[in-house]
């Protein structure tokens, strides 16, 4: 499938120079005073792991990889792999931890993730947009802090540090965005 260079987003998997590349940073759209507009894209080769910056004209069209997406349930870690189970057919697969990198700490028991396949080979794991986690460390509640819009640091059960409202206490569950690791709301 062809997409415009202006439509490239972080996480897109492109077929470029006969290799698969994942867009690793938000593309920069630039309109210089002289010359045509272009898009600066940082990509990572899925086979070799090498990173590369590439500049495409805004008028260019690139091949976006046709991916098949399936729901899988995270079961457990086995060495350097994640063990996932297909939610429809109950088949289990092992996928390298490296595929998730810094998002690995969001994996909780039984979480449902989307695994993207290219030619029956797992390429990418998409976490749900938000997860519910428990606060394990934070400063004590300050009386009257509900009226102010200030935040305090908190460490969650998975070790991630986030800023939370002053009124939250240790042991409370909160909703956290998985893409930028920010607090959304108190879990219901």
Swiss-Prot record:
Q: Which SMART domains match?
A: EFP, Elong-fact-P_C
**Where, per UniProt, does this protein localize?**
Cytoplasm
The protein's annotated pathway: Protein biosynthesis; polypeptide chain elongation
HAMAP family given in the database record: EF_P
Q: List the disulfide bonds.
A: none
InterPro entries for this protein: Elong-fact-P_C (IPR015365), NA-bd_OB-fold (IPR012340), Rib_uL2_dom2 (IPR014722), Transl_elong_fac_P/YeiP (IPR020599), Transl_elong_KOW-like (IPR013185), Transl_elong_P/YeiP_cen (IPR001059), Transl_elong_P/YeiP_CS (IPR013852), Transl_elongation_fac_P (IPR011768)
Question: What is the recorded name of this protein?
Answer: Elongation factor P
Any GO BP annotation:
peptide biosynthetic process
Gene3D superfamilies, per database record: 2.30.30.30, Nucleic acid-binding proteins (2.40.50.140)
Q: From which organism does this entry originate?
A: Rickettsia peacockii (strain Rustic)
Q: What is its main location?
A: cytoplasm
